[in-house]
Structure formats: structure tokens, C-alpha cells
Amino acid sequence: MPNGKADEVWFVYLLRCADGTLYCGVTNNIERRLTQHHRGRGARYTRGRAPFILLGHAPFPGRGEAQRVEYRIKRQPTDQKLACLATIGGDAFVAGALQSAPAEGITWNP
């Protein structure tokens, strides 16, 4: 497999940038990816928007599943993302992003 092992755990994570915007991404190593973002070597969107606050992350059994959740989260308006995180917590936020996909076993970690 070109991008890692089939049983590798991937994470969806949500950052708050210094300018108040949110960034959602996927990685198989949270610490490494945050370091990349802080050094300006992460996603283009986050360059020049440091420092960041990690609002949370959730594990998934593979890259494809993590990317599907990331896509759904990115399609939500910022105010909806923040309202979900503030009122019902991260588990429900991720479950809401999944909509029709099963949410069992997903834990959102602040």
C-alpha cells in the first residue's frame, strides 16, 4: 500500500488558528503534523496563521474513512462547527459529520 499500512490509525483533527478561523485535517501522527503546521510546513491554509489551538481529534481505522469525515466536517459552516463543539461535545460533532455512517467507537479527544 503506497501511503502506509492497511491497519494504521488515522486521525481527524480540528485546529483554531490565531486569526480565529478553523482548520480540519487528517494525519496518522498528530504531534508531527502539529509541528509541521507551527513551522509553516503544514497545509497552505495554515501558513501564517500560527499559533494554533488543537480543539480535538478523533481516531479512525484507516485513511479513507478519516478523509471522508474530514470532507463532511469541512462542508459545515464555522458557526455550526463551533455550536456543535460547545453544546454537544466532540463525539456528537464527529457523529453529526458522519450522518449516515456509523459513529460507534469514535471518541473525540480534546
Curated annotation (Swiss-Prot):
Q: Give the GIY-YIG domain ranges.
A: 8-83
Q: Which InterPro entries does this UniProt record tie to the protein?
A: GIY-YIG_endonuc (IPR000305), GIY-YIG_endonuc_sf (IPR035901), UPF0213_domain (IPR050190)
* SUPFAM superfamilies linked to this entry: GIY-YIG endonuclease
PROSITE patterns assigned to the protein according to its UniProt record, in alphabetical order:
GIY_YIG
Similarity remark: Belongs to the UPF0213 family.
Identification of the protein by name: UPF0213 protein DVU_3309
- Recorded source organism is Nitratidesulfovibrio vulgaris (strain ATCC 29579 / DSM 644 / CCUG 34227 / NCIMB 8303 / VKM B-1760 / Hildenborough) (Desulfovibrio vulgaris)
